[in-house]
Curated annotation (Swiss-Prot):
Cellular compartments annotated: Cytoplasm
Protein name listed in UniProt: GlutamylGlutaminyl-tRNA synthetase
NCBIfam families: gltX_bact (TIGR00464)
InterPro entries per the UniProt record, alphabetical: aa-tRNA-synth_I_cd-bd, aa-tRNA-synth_I_codon-bd_sub2, aa-tRNA-synth_I_CS, aa_tRNA-synth_I_cd-bd_sf, Glu-tRNA-ligase_bac/mito, Glu/Gln-tRNA-synth, Glu/Gln-tRNA-synth_Ib_cat-dom, GluQ/Sye
Keyword Hydrolase: no
Entry binding sites for ATP: K235
Its EC number(s): 6.1.1.-
Species of origin: Helicobacter pylori (strain ATCC 700392 / 26695) (Campylobacter pylori)
Keyword Plastid: no
Amino acid sequence: MLRFAPSPTGDMHIGNLRAAIFNYIVAKQQYKPFLIRIEDTDKERNIEGKDQEILEILKLMGISWDKLVYQSHNIDYHREMAEKLLKENKAFYCYASAEFLEREKEKAKNEKRPFRYSDEWATLEKDKHHAPVVRLKAPNHAVSFNDAIKKEVKFEPDELDSFVLLRQDKSPTYNFACACDDLLYKISLIIRGEDHVSNTPKQILIQQALGSNDPIVYAHLPIILDEVSGKKMSKRDEASSVKWLLNQGFLPVAIANYLITIGNKVPKEVFSLDEAIEWFSLENLSSSPAHFNLKYLKHLNHEHLKLLDDDKLLELTSIKDKNLLGLLRLFIEECGTLLELREKISLFLEPKDIVKTYENEDFKERCLALFNALTSMDFQAYKDFESFKKEAMRLSQLKGKDFFKPLRILLTGNSHGVELPLIFPYIQSHHQEVLRLKA
Protein backbone atom coordinates (compact mmCIF):
# COMPACT_ATOMS: atom_id res chain seq x y z
CA MET A 1 0.00 0.00 0.00
CA LEU A 2 1.09 3.58 -0.67
CA ARG A 3 -0.09 6.61 1.23
CA PHE A 4 -0.37 10.38 1.28
CA ALA A 5 -0.39 11.80 4.79
CA PRO A 6 -1.26 15.52 4.96
CA SER A 7 -1.74 17.57 8.12
CA PRO A 8 -4.86 19.79 8.31
CA THR A 9 -2.86 22.76 9.59
CA GLY A 10 -3.01 25.13 6.60
CA ASP A 11 -3.44 25.46 2.85
CA MET A 12 -2.10 22.57 0.80
CA HIS A 13 1.41 23.38 -0.45
CA ILE A 14 2.40 22.54 -4.04
CA GLY A 15 5.17 20.34 -2.63
CA ASN A 16 2.61 18.28 -0.73
CA LEU A 17 0.39 17.99 -3.80
CA ARG A 18 3.39 16.88 -5.86
CA ALA A 19 4.03 14.10 -3.34
CA ALA A 20 0.35 13.10 -3.41
CA ILE A 21 0.38 12.90 -7.21
CA PHE A 22 3.52 10.75 -7.32
CA ASN A 23 2.26 8.36 -4.62
CA TYR A 24 -1.05 8.03 -6.47
CA ILE A 25 0.66 7.37 -9.81
CA VAL A 26 2.95 4.67 -8.41
CA ALA A 27 0.05 3.04 -6.56
CA LYS A 28 -1.83 2.82 -9.86
CA GLN A 29 1.23 1.51 -11.69
CA GLN A 30 1.84 -1.20 -9.09
CA TYR A 31 -1.87 -2.04 -8.65
CA LYS A 32 -1.60 -1.30 -4.94
CA PRO A 33 -4.21 0.33 -2.68
CA PHE A 34 -3.81 4.07 -2.04
CA LEU A 35 -4.38 5.40 1.48
CA ILE A 36 -5.10 8.97 2.56
CA ARG A 37 -4.10 9.44 6.20
CA ILE A 38 -5.04 12.77 7.77
CA GLU A 39 -2.35 13.42 10.39
CA ASP A 40 -4.46 15.31 12.90
CA THR A 41 -2.78 14.43 16.20
CA ASP A 42 -1.50 18.00 16.73
CA LYS A 43 -4.77 19.40 18.07
CA GLU A 44 -3.35 22.88 18.71
CA ARG A 45 -2.32 23.40 15.08
CA ASN A 46 -5.27 21.73 13.36
CA ILE A 47 -7.56 24.12 11.46
CA GLU A 48 -11.21 23.15 11.24
CA GLY A 49 -12.28 22.29 7.70
CA LYS A 50 -8.76 21.98 6.26
CA ASP A 51 -9.07 18.20 6.05
CA GLN A 52 -12.11 18.50 3.77
CA GLU A 53 -10.35 21.21 1.74
CA ILE A 54 -7.41 18.86 1.17
CA LEU A 55 -9.72 16.04 0.09
CA GLU A 56 -11.61 18.34 -2.29
CA ILE A 57 -8.34 19.45 -3.91
CA LEU A 58 -7.28 15.82 -4.39
CA LYS A 59 -10.63 15.08 -6.05
CA LEU A 60 -10.21 18.10 -8.34
CA MET A 61 -6.81 16.74 -9.37
CA GLY A 62 -8.36 13.41 -10.31
CA ILE A 63 -6.84 11.60 -7.34
CA SER A 64 -9.02 8.92 -5.77
CA TRP A 65 -8.23 6.72 -2.79
CA ASP A 66 -9.09 3.27 -1.51
CA LYS A 67 -9.04 4.11 2.18
CA LEU A 68 -9.30 7.28 4.28
CA VAL A 69 -8.18 7.32 7.92
CA TYR A 70 -7.61 9.94 10.59
CA GLN A 71 -4.46 9.38 12.61
CA SER A 72 -6.13 10.52 15.85
CA HIS A 73 -8.43 7.48 15.63
CA ASN A 74 -5.38 5.24 16.14
CA ILE A 75 -4.19 6.82 19.38
CA ASP A 76 -4.99 3.72 21.47
CA TYR A 77 -2.90 1.65 19.07
CA HIS A 78 -0.01 4.14 19.39
CA ARG A 79 -0.13 3.89 23.20
CA GLU A 80 -0.30 0.10 22.97
CA MET A 81 2.86 0.09 20.84
CA ALA A 82 4.62 2.38 23.32
CA GLU A 83 3.69 0.01 26.15
CA LYS A 84 5.11 -2.90 24.14
CA LEU A 85 8.43 -1.06 23.73
CA LEU A 86 8.54 -0.23 27.46
CA LYS A 87 7.93 -3.86 28.41
CA GLU A 88 10.68 -5.02 26.04
CA ASN A 89 13.08 -2.46 27.54
CA LYS A 90 13.46 -0.71 24.17
CA ALA A 91 11.93 2.48 25.53
CA PHE A 92 11.96 4.20 28.91
CA TYR A 93 10.21 6.88 30.95
CA CYS A 94 11.94 10.25 31.13
CA TYR A 95 11.04 12.69 33.92
CA ALA A 96 13.22 15.59 32.79
CA SER A 97 11.19 18.80 32.73
CA ALA A 98 10.94 21.12 29.74
CA GLU A 99 12.78 23.76 31.79
CA PHE A 100 15.67 21.39 32.51
CA LEU A 101 15.98 20.43 28.85
CA GLU A 102 15.86 24.07 27.81
CA ARG A 103 18.77 24.86 30.14
CA GLU A 104 20.77 22.00 28.63
CA LYS A 105 20.01 23.26 25.11
CA GLU A 106 21.19 26.74 26.07
CA LYS A 107 24.37 25.26 27.58
CA ALA A 108 25.08 23.34 24.34
CA LYS A 109 24.49 26.51 22.33
CA ASN A 110 26.92 28.51 24.48
CA GLU A 111 29.51 25.75 24.15
CA LYS A 112 28.94 25.70 20.38
CA ARG A 113 28.09 22.02 20.21
CA PRO A 114 24.97 20.23 18.93
CA PHE A 115 22.39 19.43 21.58
CA ARG A 116 21.95 15.72 22.25
CA TYR A 117 19.71 14.24 24.92
CA SER A 118 21.55 12.15 27.52
CA ASP A 119 19.86 9.05 28.96
CA GLU A 120 21.37 9.98 32.35
CA TRP A 121 18.82 12.81 32.60
CA ALA A 122 15.83 10.44 32.61
CA THR A 123 15.38 10.10 36.38
CA LEU A 124 17.11 13.26 37.67
CA GLU A 125 13.79 14.98 38.36
CA LYS A 126 11.65 11.92 39.09
CA ASP A 127 11.01 13.06 42.68
CA LYS A 128 9.43 16.30 41.40
CA HIS A 129 6.42 14.27 40.21
CA HIS A 130 6.51 15.41 36.60
CA ALA A 131 4.37 13.34 34.29
CA PRO A 132 6.99 11.46 32.26
CA VAL A 133 7.43 11.21 28.53
CA VAL A 134 8.33 7.94 26.82
CA ARG A 135 11.59 7.86 24.84
CA LEU A 136 13.02 5.26 22.47
CA LYS A 137 16.51 4.16 23.48
CA ALA A 138 19.20 5.71 21.32
CA PRO A 139 20.92 3.37 18.86
CA ASN A 140 24.59 2.46 19.18
CA HIS A 141 24.89 2.00 15.43
CA ALA A 142 24.47 4.05 12.27
CA VAL A 143 21.12 4.12 10.49
CA SER A 144 21.20 4.11 6.71
CA PHE A 145 18.69 3.66 3.91
CA ASN A 146 18.86 3.60 0.14
CA ASP A 147 16.68 6.47 -1.03
CA ALA A 148 15.05 5.96 -4.44
CA ILE A 149 16.02 9.53 -5.40
CA LYS A 150 18.87 10.62 -3.12
CA LYS A 151 20.61 7.19 -3.13
CA GLU A 152 22.36 6.15 0.13
CA VAL A 153 21.59 8.30 3.17
CA LYS A 154 23.39 7.58 6.43
CA PHE A 155 23.03 8.89 10.00
CA GLU A 156 25.82 8.21 12.50
CA PRO A 157 25.05 7.27 16.14
CA ASP A 158 26.10 10.71 17.41
CA GLU A 159 23.42 12.28 15.20
CA LEU A 160 20.65 10.35 16.96
CA ASP A 161 19.59 10.42 20.59
CA SER A 162 16.80 8.91 22.67
CA PHE A 163 13.83 10.74 21.20
CA VAL A 164 10.28 11.13 22.50
CA LEU A 165 7.53 8.68 21.49
CA LEU A 166 4.75 9.76 23.85
CA ARG A 167 4.38 13.24 25.32
CA GLN A 168 3.45 13.94 28.96
CA ASP A 169 -0.25 13.82 28.05
CA LYS A 170 0.32 10.41 26.43
CA SER A 171 -0.26 11.77 22.94
CA PRO A 172 2.08 10.35 20.28
CA THR A 173 4.74 12.46 18.63
CA TYR A 174 4.67 12.89 14.86
CA ASN A 175 7.40 10.34 14.19
CA PHE A 176 5.95 7.70 16.49
CA ALA A 177 2.39 7.97 15.15
CA CYS A 178 3.69 8.01 11.59
CA ALA A 179 5.94 4.97 12.03
CA CYS A 180 3.24 2.97 13.84
CA ASP A 181 0.62 3.74 11.21
CA ASP A 182 2.94 2.92 8.34
CA LEU A 183 3.39 -0.52 9.91
CA LEU A 184 -0.31 -0.90 10.67
CA TYR A 185 -1.33 -0.27 7.06
CA LYS A 186 1.62 -2.18 5.57
CA ILE A 187 2.99 0.80 3.65
CA SER A 188 5.67 -0.37 1.21
CA LEU A 189 6.83 2.88 -0.42
CA ILE A 190 6.76 6.47 0.85
CA ILE A 191 7.29 9.39 -1.54
CA ARG A 192 7.57 12.68 0.33
CA GLY A 193 9.52 15.94 0.53
CA GLU A 194 13.19 15.96 1.48
CA ASP A 195 12.33 18.02 4.57
CA HIS A 196 11.36 14.61 6.02
CA VAL A 197 14.83 13.07 5.53
CA SER A 198 15.77 13.77 9.17
CA ASN A 199 12.56 12.02 10.31
CA THR A 200 13.31 8.86 8.37
CA PRO A 201 16.03 7.33 10.65
CA LYS A 202 13.76 7.83 13.66
CA GLN A 203 10.86 6.12 11.91
CA ILE A 204 13.13 3.28 10.80
CA LEU A 205 14.36 2.80 14.39
CA ILE A 206 10.79 2.72 15.70
CA GLN A 207 9.74 0.14 13.11
CA GLN A 208 12.79 -2.01 13.84
CA ALA A 209 12.10 -1.82 17.57
CA LEU A 210 8.52 -2.94 16.92
CA GLY A 211 9.85 -6.00 15.10
CA SER A 212 9.25 -5.05 11.49
CA ASN A 213 10.99 -7.28 8.96
CA ASP A 214 9.63 -5.47 5.91
CA PRO A 215 11.65 -2.30 5.38
CA ILE A 216 9.87 0.56 3.66
CA VAL A 217 11.35 2.10 0.52
CA TYR A 218 11.71 5.89 0.79
CA ALA A 219 11.87 8.47 -1.99
CA HIS A 220 12.51 12.03 -0.83
CA LEU A 221 11.58 14.71 -3.35
CA PRO A 222 13.89 17.73 -3.70
CA ILE A 223 12.45 21.02 -2.53
CA ILE A 224 10.81 23.52 -4.87
CA LEU A 225 12.62 26.86 -5.05
CA ASP A 226 11.05 30.27 -5.63
CA GLU A 227 11.76 31.54 -9.15
CA VAL A 228 12.78 35.03 -7.95
CA SER A 229 14.60 34.56 -4.64
CA GLY A 230 15.94 31.07 -5.33
CA LYS A 231 14.94 30.13 -1.78
CA LYS A 232 12.63 27.34 -0.69
CA MET A 233 8.99 28.20 -1.36
CA SER A 234 7.30 28.65 1.99
CA LYS A 235 3.65 28.83 2.96
CA ARG A 236 3.99 32.62 2.85
CA ASP A 237 4.52 32.50 -0.93
CA GLU A 238 1.12 32.87 -2.61
CA ALA A 239 2.03 30.63 -5.54
CA SER A 240 2.99 27.81 -3.16
CA SER A 241 -0.67 27.42 -2.18
CA VAL A 242 -2.71 25.09 -4.39
CA LYS A 243 -5.85 26.93 -3.29
CA TRP A 244 -4.38 30.24 -4.51
CA LEU A 245 -3.46 28.73 -7.88
CA LEU A 246 -6.97 27.36 -8.32
CA ASN A 247 -8.49 30.73 -7.38
CA GLN A 248 -6.23 32.40 -9.95
CA GLY A 249 -7.79 30.25 -12.66
CA PHE A 250 -5.22 27.50 -13.12
CA LEU A 251 -6.89 24.25 -14.15
CA PRO A 252 -6.30 21.21 -11.91
CA VAL A 253 -5.04 19.20 -14.90
CA ALA A 254 -2.51 21.94 -15.71
CA ILE A 255 -1.27 22.15 -12.12
CA ALA A 256 -0.79 18.37 -12.04
CA ASN A 257 0.92 18.48 -15.46
CA TYR A 258 3.32 21.15 -14.18
CA LEU A 259 4.15 19.44 -10.86
CA ILE A 260 4.90 16.17 -12.66
CA THR A 261 7.10 18.02 -15.17
CA ILE A 262 9.41 20.03 -12.90
CA GLY A 263 12.61 18.21 -12.01
CA ASN A 264 11.57 15.30 -14.20
CA LYS A 265 12.19 13.80 -17.65
CA VAL A 266 8.84 13.71 -19.42
CA PRO A 267 8.13 12.38 -22.94
CA LYS A 268 5.77 15.22 -23.89
CA GLU A 269 4.93 18.72 -22.73
CA VAL A 270 1.15 18.59 -22.31
CA PHE A 271 -0.46 15.55 -20.72
CA SER A 272 -3.09 14.36 -18.25
CA LEU A 273 -2.64 12.49 -14.99
CA ASP A 274 -3.89 9.28 -16.62
CA GLU A 275 -1.31 9.65 -19.38
CA ALA A 276 1.47 10.14 -16.82
CA ILE A 277 0.55 6.82 -15.19
CA GLU A 278 1.63 5.13 -18.42
CA TRP A 279 5.24 6.37 -18.35
CA PHE A 280 6.14 7.97 -14.99
CA SER A 281 9.25 6.61 -13.26
CA LEU A 282 10.94 7.67 -10.02
CA GLU A 283 14.26 7.01 -11.75
CA ASN A 284 13.69 10.03 -14.00
CA LEU A 285 13.36 12.47 -11.10
CA SER A 286 16.29 14.78 -10.48
CA SER A 287 17.91 14.86 -7.05
CA SER A 288 18.46 18.62 -7.45
CA PRO A 289 15.92 21.25 -6.32
CA ALA A 290 13.19 22.17 -8.80
CA HIS A 291 12.60 25.83 -9.69
CA PHE A 292 9.04 27.10 -9.71
CA ASN A 293 8.17 29.02 -12.88
CA LEU A 294 4.76 30.69 -12.89
CA LYS A 295 5.18 31.78 -16.51
CA TYR A 296 5.65 28.19 -17.67
CA LEU A 297 2.71 27.02 -15.55
CA LYS A 298 0.64 29.70 -17.30
CA HIS A 299 1.80 28.38 -20.67
CA LEU A 300 0.73 24.84 -19.77
CA ASN A 301 -2.57 26.16 -18.47
CA HIS A 302 -3.13 27.96 -21.78
CA GLU A 303 -2.56 24.69 -23.64
CA HIS A 304 -5.03 22.85 -21.39
CA LEU A 305 -7.61 25.63 -21.83
CA LYS A 306 -7.45 24.97 -25.56
CA LEU A 307 -8.11 21.27 -24.94
CA LEU A 308 -11.31 21.81 -22.94
CA ASP A 309 -14.39 20.33 -24.59
CA ASP A 310 -17.30 22.65 -25.34
CA ASP A 311 -19.48 21.67 -22.38
CA LYS A 312 -16.62 22.03 -19.88
CA LEU A 313 -15.61 25.39 -21.34
CA LEU A 314 -19.16 26.72 -20.98
CA GLU A 315 -19.38 25.36 -17.44
CA LEU A 316 -16.09 26.88 -16.29
CA THR A 317 -16.89 30.30 -17.74
CA SER A 318 -20.53 30.23 -16.54
CA ILE A 319 -21.70 30.95 -20.11
CA LYS A 320 -25.05 29.40 -21.01
CA ASP A 321 -25.18 30.62 -24.62
CA LYS A 322 -23.55 27.99 -26.87
CA ASN A 323 -23.39 30.58 -29.67
CA LEU A 324 -20.52 32.21 -27.77
CA LEU A 325 -18.29 29.12 -27.89
CA GLY A 326 -16.42 30.42 -30.93
CA LEU A 327 -15.77 33.72 -29.16
CA LEU A 328 -14.48 31.90 -26.09
CA ARG A 329 -12.07 29.95 -28.31
CA LEU A 330 -10.81 33.23 -29.80
CA PHE A 331 -10.35 34.75 -26.35
CA ILE A 332 -8.46 31.66 -25.12
CA GLU A 333 -5.67 32.48 -27.56
CA GLU A 334 -4.89 35.54 -25.42
CA CYS A 335 -5.46 34.00 -22.00
CA GLY A 336 -3.17 32.10 -19.68
CA THR A 337 -5.75 31.43 -16.96
CA LEU A 338 -9.43 30.79 -16.54
CA LEU A 339 -9.64 34.02 -14.54
CA GLU A 340 -8.37 36.02 -17.53
CA LEU A 341 -10.82 34.26 -19.84
CA ARG A 342 -13.76 34.95 -17.53
CA GLU A 343 -12.74 38.60 -17.31
CA LYS A 344 -12.59 38.95 -21.11
CA ILE A 345 -16.02 37.44 -21.72
CA SER A 346 -17.50 39.46 -18.83
CA LEU A 347 -16.10 42.73 -20.20
CA PHE A 348 -17.53 41.82 -23.61
CA LEU A 349 -21.07 41.19 -22.31
CA GLU A 350 -21.31 43.67 -19.44
CA PRO A 351 -22.10 47.42 -19.71
CA LYS A 352 -18.92 49.28 -20.66
CA ASP A 353 -17.25 51.58 -18.13
CA ILE A 354 -15.88 54.52 -20.14
CA VAL A 355 -15.40 56.57 -16.97
CA LYS A 356 -12.84 54.01 -15.76
CA THR A 357 -11.08 53.78 -19.11
CA TYR A 358 -11.16 57.30 -20.54
CA GLU A 359 -7.89 59.23 -20.69
CA ASN A 360 -9.33 62.76 -20.59
CA GLU A 361 -12.56 64.65 -21.23
CA ASP A 362 -11.93 64.70 -24.99
CA PHE A 363 -11.63 60.91 -25.04
CA LYS A 364 -14.84 60.56 -23.03
CA GLU A 365 -16.63 62.84 -25.50
CA ARG A 366 -15.39 60.74 -28.44
CA CYS A 367 -16.64 57.58 -26.72
CA LEU A 368 -20.07 59.14 -26.19
CA ALA A 369 -20.23 60.44 -29.77
CA LEU A 370 -19.33 57.01 -31.13
CA PHE A 371 -21.77 55.31 -28.74
CA ASN A 372 -24.60 57.49 -30.03
CA ALA A 373 -23.63 56.68 -33.61
CA LEU A 374 -23.50 52.94 -32.91
CA THR A 375 -26.88 52.87 -31.18
CA SER A 376 -28.46 54.32 -34.32
CA MET A 377 -27.06 51.54 -36.51
CA ASP A 378 -28.67 48.23 -37.45
CA PHE A 379 -25.84 45.79 -36.68
CA GLN A 380 -27.45 42.98 -38.67
CA ALA A 381 -27.45 45.07 -41.85
CA TYR A 382 -23.70 44.80 -42.43
CA LYS A 383 -22.17 41.85 -44.25
CA ASP A 384 -18.74 42.34 -42.68
CA PHE A 385 -16.75 44.46 -40.25
CA GLU A 386 -15.34 46.67 -43.02
CA SER A 387 -18.76 47.96 -44.11
CA PHE A 388 -19.82 48.39 -40.48
CA LYS A 389 -16.64 50.32 -39.69
CA LYS A 390 -17.07 52.74 -42.60
CA GLU A 391 -20.64 53.58 -41.58
CA ALA A 392 -19.66 54.04 -37.93
CA MET A 393 -16.85 56.42 -38.95
CA ARG A 394 -19.22 58.40 -41.16
CA LEU A 395 -21.87 58.77 -38.47
CA SER A 396 -19.44 59.62 -35.66
CA GLN A 397 -17.16 61.85 -37.74
CA LEU A 398 -14.20 60.11 -36.09
CA LYS A 399 -11.22 58.43 -37.72
CA GLY A 400 -7.85 56.87 -36.99
CA LYS A 401 -6.90 56.40 -33.34
CA ASP A 402 -9.73 58.71 -32.28
CA PHE A 403 -12.13 56.15 -33.74
CA PHE A 404 -10.55 52.73 -33.17
CA LYS A 405 -9.67 52.99 -29.48
CA PRO A 406 -13.16 54.13 -28.39
CA LEU A 407 -14.67 51.52 -30.73
CA ARG A 408 -12.72 48.66 -29.16
CA ILE A 409 -13.60 49.80 -25.64
CA LEU A 410 -17.29 50.18 -26.49
CA LEU A 411 -17.47 46.77 -28.19
CA THR A 412 -15.14 44.65 -26.03
CA GLY A 413 -14.55 46.57 -22.80
CA ASN A 414 -10.82 46.37 -23.52
CA SER A 415 -8.34 48.71 -25.19
CA HIS A 416 -6.58 45.77 -26.88
CA GLY A 417 -7.27 42.17 -27.79
CA VAL A 418 -8.51 39.91 -30.58
CA GLU A 419 -8.86 41.58 -33.99
CA LEU A 420 -12.30 43.17 -34.26
CA PRO A 421 -13.11 41.61 -37.68
CA LEU A 422 -12.76 38.15 -36.06
CA ILE A 423 -15.21 38.87 -33.25
CA PHE A 424 -17.59 41.04 -35.28
CA PRO A 425 -20.06 38.16 -35.92
CA TYR A 426 -20.46 37.76 -32.13
CA ILE A 427 -20.87 41.52 -31.73
CA GLN A 428 -23.63 41.44 -34.34
CA SER A 429 -25.52 38.58 -32.69
CA HIS A 430 -25.17 40.01 -29.17
CA HIS A 431 -25.09 43.76 -29.85
CA GLN A 432 -27.93 44.49 -27.43
CA GLU A 433 -25.83 43.11 -24.56
CA VAL A 434 -22.52 44.40 -25.90
CA LEU A 435 -23.48 47.99 -26.65
CA ARG A 436 -24.34 49.26 -23.18
CA LEU A 437 -22.77 51.88 -20.92
CA LYS A 438 -22.33 51.54 -17.19
CA ALA A 439 -24.45 54.10 -15.36
